[in-house]
Amino acid sequence: MHNLIPTVIEHTGNYERVFDIYSRLLRERIIFLSGEINDLKADTVIAQLLFLESEDSNKDIYLYLNSPGGSITAGLAIYDTMQYIKPDVRTICIGQAASMGAFLLAGGAKGKRESLAYSRIMIHQPWGGISGQASDINIQANEILRLKKLIIDIMSNQIGIDKEKLALDMERDYFMTSNDALKYGLIDSILVRE
């Protein structure tokens, strides 16, 4: 989150309540995920998803994404929770959804994955720094390959694209405009003012 968090004053009867903007938006079932995806952010998003499900398991949850990506395991924890809970999770890209951010964008409920017009989306294969003994490097390399296959399997199912094409596109950074992402199947619509 940010160092300076705006507050909102809500007037109810004779009382005033001050909320930080994120808590106020959470009351409207809106979650923000911005910046690098890590374990701390994943824990926060997962807690918010579970809380909103307990509040009303039939109303959609809105997950706004502006992320360059991050930890695969943290992203998979968020994705698993999105698929586990009963409410549909609408995903909306604002700014960018790259790497694990794009994976989460595509992981929204089918028909409810959206982007603002000038956002950018980027997919690529998992990467990580490996060091240590030769046997440890081999173990880590095998795990990265396993995660790559898992991400491709999940994404190809989620967006309805051939696994081989997706794997080929993910070999290098593959940038898309919102229109490109719509054609690709990563999103279902582009949000514009009516």
UniProtKB/Swiss-Prot annotation:
Signal peptide extent: none
Similarity field: Belongs to the peptidase S14 family.
EC supergroup of this enzyme: hydrolase
Encoding gene per record: clpP
Name of the molecule in the record: ATP-dependent Clp protease proteolytic subunit
HAMAP family, per the entry: ClpP (MF_00444)
Origin species: Borrelia garinii subsp. bavariensis (strain ATCC BAA-2496 / DSM 23469 / PBi) (Borreliella bavariensis)
A GO biological-process term: protein quality control for misfolded or incompletely synthesized proteins
Catalyzed reactions per annotation: Hydrolysis of proteins to small peptides in the presence of ATP and magnesium. alpha-casein is the usual test substrate. In the absence of ATP, only oligopeptides shorter than five residues are hydrolyzed (such as succinyl-Leu-Tyr-|-NHMec, and Leu-Tyr-Leu-|-Tyr-Trp, in which cleavage of the -Tyr-|-Leu- and -Tyr-|-Trp bonds also occurs)
Subcellular location: Cytoplasm
Keyword Glycoprotein belongs to the record: no
Keywords: Cytoplasm, Hydrolase, Protease, Serine protease
Pfam families documented for this protein: CLP_protease
Function: Cleaves peptides in various proteins in a process that requires ATP hydrolysis. Has a chymotrypsin-like activity. Plays a major role in the degradation of misfolded proteins.
Catalytic residues in the record: S99 (nucleophile), H124
GO molecular function annotation: ATP-dependent peptidase activity; ATPase binding; serine-type endopeptidase activity
Coiled-coil intervals: none
Subunit text: Fourteen ClpP subunits assemble into 2 heptameric rings which stack back to back to give a disk-like structure with a central cavity, resembling the structure of eukaryotic proteasomes.
GO cellular component: cytoplasm; endopeptidase Clp complex
Keyword Protease: yes
EC numbers: 3.4.21.92
Top-level taxon of origin: Bacteria
InterPro entries registered for this protein in UniProt: ClpP (IPR001907), ClpP/crotonase-like_dom_sf (IPR029045), ClpP/TepA (IPR023562), ClpP_His_AS (IPR033135), ClpP_Ser_AS (IPR018215)
PANTHER family: ATP-DEPENDENT CLP PROTEASE PROTEOLYTIC SUBUNIT
